[in-house]
Swiss-Prot record:
UniProt pathway: Amino-sugar metabolism; N-acetylneuraminate degradation; D-fructose 6-phosphate from N-acetylneuraminate: step 3/5
Keyword match Secreted: no
GO molecular function: N-acylglucosamine-6-phosphate 2-epimerase activity
Protein's gene: nanE
Reactions performed catalytically: an N-acyl-D-glucosamine 6-phosphate = an N-acyl-D-mannosamine 6-phosphate
NCBIfam families: PRK01130.1
Main function: Converts N-acetylmannosamine-6-phosphate (ManNAc-6-P) to N-acetylglucosamine-6-phosphate (GlcNAc-6-P).
EC numbers: 5.1.3.9
Transmembrane segments: none
Record-linked HAMAP family: ManNAc6P_epimer (MF_01235)
Top-level enzyme category: isomerase
Annotated protein name in UniProt: Putative N-acetylmannosamine-6-phosphate 2-epimerase
GO-annotated cellular components: cytosol
Organism whose genome encodes this protein: Klebsiella aerogenes
Source species taxonomy: Bacteria, Pseudomonadati, Pseudomonadota, Gammaproteobacteria, Enterobacterales
Coiled coil feature spans: none
C-alpha cells in the first residue's frame, strides 16, 4: 500500500490531525530530544502525521514514531525570501534523515532552485512532495508540476500584514480543483480545524496551538490583560 493510501486510512480512522513540532527558535524547548518527545506524544494522542524541521530534529524523531513524517529545512537566505527547503541538498539531507514527505516552498518568488527541480529531486529519491503555497495560482502550478500534496502553509505570510484567521477560502478552492490539500496556517482552535475539513481539506496541520508554549501563553496573557485592564482604562 502506498504512503498516501496509508495516510488516507489513518485520516478516516483518526480525523486528519497533523502536528507540527517546531519550537520557537532559541526557546528552552528548542532541543532535538524535546522535539522528539513532543512528536511521540502527538502520535500517541492520535496525530496521523508529524511536521518536523531540521535534520537534527528529524533524526531524533524518526526512530521513535511510526506515523509519516513531513520534513523540511528552514533557511534565511540573503538573496531570496524563500525559507522552506530552498536547496537541492536540503532534500537529500531530509531523505537521509528519514522524512517520508518533503515540504518545499511552492511560491512564485526568486529562489536558488526552481520548484520543478526540487520536485524532481524529491521524486528521484522516492519521496512524496508537498508544496507549501501562498495562493491558488501557486498551488495549482505545483499540483500540475507533480506535487502530491499542496498546503496553504504560506497564505498570509508573503505580504506585509498577516491576517488573524486561516484561509478557508483557499482550502475550498483547492479542494474543488481536485487537489489533495493540507490546511495549514493559523488553525488555532479545534473549530477552525474542523471547518477546514468541511471545506474539503485532506488533513489539517496545527503547530503553534499545540507545540509553541510561548505563543499559547501570549494568547492567554493578551486576553487576561484585556479583561483586567480594558482599553478605556489603560
Amino acid at each position: 500500500m502506498s504512503l498516501l493510501a496509508q495516510l488516507d486510512q489513518r485520516i478516516r480512522h483518526h480525523g486528519g490531525l497533523i502536528v507540527s513540532c517546531q519550537p520557537v527558535p532559541g526557546s528552552p524547548l528548542d532541543n532535538p530530544a524535546i522535539v522528539a518527545a513532543m512528536a511521540l506524544a502527538a502520535e500517541q494522542a492520535g496525530a496521523v502525521a508529524l511536521r518536523i524541521e531540521g535534520q537534527a530534529n528529524l533524526q531524533a524523531v524518526r526512530p521513535l514514531v511510526t506515523v509519516p513524517v513531513i520534513g523540511l529545512i528552514k533557511r534565511d537566505l540573503p538573496d531570496s525570501p524563500v525559507r522552506i527547503t530552498p536547496w537541492l541538498e536540503d532534500i537529500d539531507a531530509l531523505a537521509q534523515g528519514g522524512a517520508d514527505i518533503i515540504a518545499i516552498d511552492g511560491t512564485q518568488r526568486q529562489r536558488p532552485a526552481s520548484v520543478s527541480a526540487l520536485l524532481a529531486e524529491i521524486h528521484r529519491l522516492g519521496k512524496v512532495a508537498m508544496a507549501d503555497c501562498s495562493s491558488l495560482d501557486d498551488a495549482l502550478e505545483c499540483w500540475q508540476l507533480g506535487a502530491e500534496i499542496v498546503g496553504t502553509t504560506l497564505s498570509g505570510y508573503t505580504a506585509e500584514e498577516t491576517p488573524d484567521e486561516p484561509d478557508l477560502a483557499l482550502v475550498q478552492c483547492l479542494s474543488v480543483a481536485g487537489c489533495r490539500v493540507i490546511a495549514e496556517g493559523r488553525y488555532n482552535t479545534p473549530a477552525q480545524a474542523a471547518e477546514a475539513m468541511r471545506c474539503g481539506a485532506w488533513a489539517v496541520t496545527v503547530g503553534s496551538a499545540i507545540t509553541r508554549l510561548e505563543h499559547i501563553c501570549g494568547w492567554y496573557n493578551t486576553a487576561l490583560k484585556a479583561a483586567v485592564y480594558p482599553a478605556n482604562e489603560q
